[in-house]
Amino acid sequence: MMGVPARPAFVLLGDPIPVNSSVIPEPEGWEDSLTGLEGPDLWQRVLVTEVTRAIRYGRALTVVVAEVDGIVELGDQWGTDIARHSLREIAQCLRRLTRTSDYCTRIGLTRFGVVLTETNEVEAINFVERAREEAPRTLPRSGDGVRLAFGWASPLAGESAGSLVLRADRRLMQEMANR
């Protein structure tokens, strides 16, 4: 009998923001109970499957990682309920912007992963710009200090899912460093 494989290191690439876990629970399993999105276990499986398929059949695919910056400070200032509500609203915004063929998951305390199937990098940039514009509108007035940073990458021939996510993560870290 095969068990569920251990979560590889590429799934959660380190949360660059110190997080008070009493404010926001860590996502676990197949579904995230806080946001209603799929969880890190689905992210792990979908990444390998969809990246392999895209490379094998020469199909477009882009992986997007999004980091919510300022959510912990929001919780410290306005309370846990506001922080959790804000994270749920951002999750629902990302979900609304994806198609039924895409995957939108919560993969870390303040991190989301999106697999955009049949989407090249130019189309993914359009997704990112729509999310940058719409996500802040979903937050309560107290969420003014909350910002989203994004990284994205499309697979290169023969590239592993882990390498793809690392490239997207590097782009995310670069954006966060340039703020």
Segment roles from a protein language model:
Residues 61-63, 101-102, 145:
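Structural motif
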Residues 1-52, 102-103, 159:
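Signal-transducing coiled-coil linker helices
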Residues 24, 169, 173-179:
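Short, charged, intrinsically disordered terminal tails
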Residues 116-121, 135:
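Hydrophobic, well-ordered secondary-structure segments
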Residues 76, 117, 140, 176-177:
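Short, conserved catalytic or interaction motifs in soluble domains
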Residues 96-101, 132-143:
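Short catalytic/binding micro-motifs of nucleotide second-messenger systems
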Residues 32, 37-51, 55-62, 69-95, ...:
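Conserved long alpha-helical elements within nucleotide-processing catalytic cores of c-di-GMP signaling
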Residues 106, 110-117, 142-171:
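A short glycine-enriched loop-to-beta-strand structural element that forms part of the catalytic core
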